[in-house]
Amino acid sequence: MRYNDLIFLNLFRNYKDEFAGVGRRDFVIYLEELVKAGEYGIALEDFLVQMYEYDLEISSNDLTIIKNLCEGVNIDSNLWLVLSIKATGD
């Protein structure tokens, strides 16, 4: 299934500065390349794992988007549920 690349790209780009702040300047570029190759699940999973590993806060609006994307690409809810604990209000 082909998804709207912009949904993924905009989500990842929202956190470009946060990743740069933890020394992962090229991480969003890596995610963009995965999306352009149609590897939505891998990109989203890597994004979620790195958000957790670096203890980055996620907005509640983005968390809703992530939940829907995870359901669409069959990613285990445990990956995004962990982030929901520390989601920030918008």
What are these regions (language model features)?
Residues 1-90:
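C-terminal-biased regions
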